Amino acid sequence: MREIDELVQVEEPAWPELRKMVADGSVPVQVLPADAGEGRRCLLQMQVTARSVLGALALHTGGLLVDDGWVRVFGGGPGAATGLPSLAQVNRFPAEFDPGWHPATGLVVGHDAVGGVFALNGGDPAAAGRPGAPGQMTYFAPDTLAWEAMELGHSGWVAWLLSGRLETFYDGLRWPGWRAEAAALDHSQGIAVYPFLWSEEAHADLAATSRRPVPMREVLGVAAEAARQAGAGDAGFLGEV
């Protein structure tokens, strides 16, 4: 176990470069204010240093709202003040540091407005029913109700989010006017789409669907239940919001 000072006080911290990436990125990004105590709690439980992008996000931000809030990247926020939970809150970290605790199926590091989930694989993804290699990012796709390997680590994923390639990634999941709808959400809300994103109707004409803001926990819960009913298997832990 490494103590908190060893995790925080490092040479070549990632935050200056990450801050520059955010400023120079081709998509709009809002950096939410951090809670210093919550950020340090995240670092201690994850045992990552401030040299990593994951550590920098936890220590220096309350999360990122990418592309007008379409993607929420979790950091070390206070939760109640911003509506965006911290990494500790969304992953149900123990209240006190527990060296034996690890996320059961991977670390949830982001959500998107329609219930997509970004998670970082743990040491044995296959045992958790997840694709990809250990330490690789995965995505729970709300239009297929399945996990997909992204072939990126966490730092590569953050760079990818800021690179302007989201339009291609979300082809078929965005409709005319999506940006205004995402920007109008409270940080604890997602967009409920009906007919559901995984339905033939939505695949055929997404623009014709009806949409409304609802608590994100409802968006995730409906998708998880639909995956079970469709025989796609247990989606697993999608985050506590």
Language-model features: locations:
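A surface-exposed partner-binding patch
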Residues: M1-P125, R179-V241
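Acidic, low-complexity intrinsically disordered regions
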Residues: E11, V66, F97, D143, ...
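Compact, glycine/acidic-enriched structural inserts
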Residues: G129-G172
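Short aromatic loop motif centered on NTY/YTY
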Residues: W157-P195
